[in-house]
Amino acid sequence: MSAASFAVSTFLFHQFRLDREHLVDIAAHGFGAVEIFALRSHFDYSDPAAVSDLVEWLDDTRLELTAVHAPTAERLVDGVWTGNLSLASTDAAIRERAVAEVQLTLDLVRVVPFRTLVLHVGVPADIAAATDNDAGAARRSLDLIVPYAAACGVQVALEVQTNALSTPDALVGLIEDAADWPPAGICLDVGHARLLGDPVDAIETASGLIVASHVHDTRGSRDDHLVPYDGSIEWARALLAFQKVGYAGPWTFELAASVPAITTLARAAHARQRFEQCLGINDELMSQ
């Protein structure tokens, strides 16, 4: 299994401005790829200088940019998220701003190639306002975004989240109902799937549509974004389920911001080694 099969999301550093050392640290811990968390206060995807720096840093570190996570807010300031960008908002101004920001993020591909755009459909239920999670508004947004992404050569991956629009069943239904869309897929976020129930059930439900993954753990009641094996998820079962539905990566570690982040990266590298061992064992079992 290649190093590029395992990525780290820069969500790990999202409270800081992205810099070269963040990518150096990811590469130094044996990861071959990165997912950029698009947030203007972290990585300003609208700034040509920031984009140029990213291209240089990726070249320096030999990291592959496998995916970009579309913005869900405009900024994080002193620990406070500002500028809601819900694609499912009934507020037309918010929704149109969100669509415009996603399209601006997709324009990155003209300078730095990536295959997948991870997208939130609405807002997690525990923090959502009454206007944030409307199915009709979400569909109108996606009717614009999915074709725009396809024209850029990028596939949209709708992320499993803890709201009614983003359960595995809901996302499968949304994609199947949108017969006029270019191919879209699902980002199976294992931590979120655990909060909804059994991740194995989620993986089986999304079978055939999984094009991306977020791997992180949870103790079962909060979206903790822990290093795998630090929470309640049975990873051997989950990884075998992924293999049974034909998903082979990338496995993107989307981990909570921590200080120092390098400690989290070291523990993530150990978890990656356990993944590699588990996937190898599962390969042997499935070939018998």
Model regions: which residues?
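Acidic/histidine-rich catalytic cores of soluble enzymes
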Residues: A4-S5, A33-V34, N133, R139-S232
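Non-cysteine beta-strand/loop elements that form the S-adenosyl-L-methionine
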Residues: T66-P71, L119, S207-R219, F253
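Short, electropositive alpha-helical surface patch
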Residues: D91, D126-A137, P168-W181, I262-L279
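Active-site groove signature of glycoside hydrolases
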Residues: T105-A129, A157
